[in-house]
Amino acid sequence: MAETKLLDGRLIVTTGDITKMKTEAIVNAANTSLMGGGGVDGAIHRGGGPAILEECKQIRKGRYPDGLPTGDAVVTTAGSLSAAHVIHTVGPVWHGGGSGEADKLTSCYRRSLEEAANLRLKDVAFPAISTGIYGYPKEKAAEVAFAAVREYLASSKLPETVYFVFYSPADARLFLDTVNG
């Protein structure tokens, strides 16, 4: 699938392996432990090597001894990945939609973008947060993700470009179909 540009070219939807993105930062759909896991989280930890885990351990010892709260974000090195930074955020587990999941997912995107802007990063790449093992319905997650990024970019110059990186063309198409009505 070719890249699709939205929001005056500031949002780019593409497919591929997020660990191979050459953006200044990639976002990790982490768990609260920050110790790596399955899916994107495991792939990022494996691809970046031990430097990511070591920095996550230091974060756990310091700021977040009980784990990173859902909806928050922290930045680490990207180790041996192409990106310079990994922004770890913890998405909500889907419980039917009545447990504040949309607000928590919005916070994941907003906090990740704030962290990128604080570092003066020009671009950042997101996976589809919470749509894997956490069970967030992909259409609903697409609506939340798009709205959160659109709102953030409307009032912030940085990051200049946001990528949504989908592993499969089908998921990218579903996202585009959802946000284009």
Regions found by a protein language model. Give the residues of each.
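Macrodomain-like recognition of ADP-ribose-binding/processing modules
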Residues: 1-181
